[in-house]
From Swiss-Prot:
GO cellular component, one term: plasma membrane
Name of the protein in its database record: UPF0060 membrane protein RHOS4_03690
Bilayer disposition of the protein: Multi-pass membrane protein
Main location: membrane
InterPro entries: UPF0060
Pfam families: UPF0060
Subcellular location: Cell inner membrane
Alphabetical UniProt keywords: Cell inner membrane, Cell membrane, Membrane, Transmembrane, Transmembrane helix
Keyword Transferase carried by entry: no
UniProt keyword Zinc present: no
Family: Belongs to the UPF0060 family.
Chain segments annotated as transmembrane: 5-25, 32-52, 62-82, 86-106
Amino acid sequence: MGLSLAAYAGAALAEIAGCFAVWAWWRLGASALWLVPGALSLGTFAWLLALTPVEAAGRSYAVYGGVYVAASLLWLWAVEGVRPDRWDMGGAALVLAGAAVILWAPRG
């Protein structure tokens, strides 16, 4: 379980950082050199997501979706300086609950 959570959290950080690099170049006028670490971050994201111990890619992606929503709100607050509101937090709680059901449901 620890490796799974670490892989999902690392994947979220890598994807958000990679996407933000493109955002910074495209929307904020940052240098095109931002695209280099952005591409590396997105490659790291894919690699980390492949490490998750889930038997089907689609299920792994579904669980990751919940982690991504929560991590995006942390990024919003920590990096962009915008505090998430109660609707953001409520939505994140809902998707994390759904991700937990998908990840830990008994299958057999």
